[in-house]
Design a protein with these regions (language model features):
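Short polybasic/polar patches that bind polyanions
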Residues: 34, 54, 103
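Glycine-rich active-site loop/strand segments that organize a redox cofactor
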Residues: 39, 54-97
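N-terminal Rossmann-like FAD-binding beta1-loop-alpha1 element of flavoenzymes
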Residues: 13-42
Length: 144
């Protein structure tokens, strides 16, 4: 896997958006912010993408809705190239899917793995969020 080094957040980084978590929603939000021309990073406490599908690794873990409905629909090429092996995919397959999406869209370069949010404070004077993490501070317009 092609992951960012743990805690790779410069001390006074400023971006348009900070997203907490690299699960389904966090990966989509990073993709969406980039497509709008925004600079963004994702802060993820784990050492890889996946969110729930990274953390919940127990026998029999699987999706409880049809997997095709669980897939991203914003990339027709991705929809065409990824074939689910089961109607209700298992945790390992869903995690592989999210890893594939992160790699295909080069999302990992803007994800800070093994990084926890310690606080987020709105600064009235600058109209920005001041986010303190386990690896440093970040200033952003949007905290998601």
């Amino acid at each position: 896997m092609n992951q960012q080094a743990s805690g790779n957040v410069p001390a006074s980084q400023a971006v348009d958006g900070v997203v907490v978590g690299a699960g389904f929603a966090g990966l989509y939000m990073l993709h969406r912010l980039r497509s709008m021309g925004c600079s963004a990073i994702v802060l993820e406490s784990a050492d890889d993408v996946g969110g729930t599908w990274y953390w919940n690794r127990y026998p029999g873990a699987r999706c409880d809705i049809m997997t095709v409905d669980y897939s991203y629909s914003w990339d027709p090429e991705l929809e065409a190239e990824w074939q689910w092996s089961e109607k209700y995919a298992t945790q390992p397959e869903i995690l592989r899917y999210l890893q594939h999406v992160a790699d295909k869209h080069d999302l990992r370069r803007d994800i800070r793995f093994s990084t926890r949010v310690e606080s987020a404070i709105w600064d009235e004077e600058t109209s920005r969020w001041q986010v303190r993490t386990s690896a440093g501070e970040i200033s952003c317009r949007y905290f998601i």
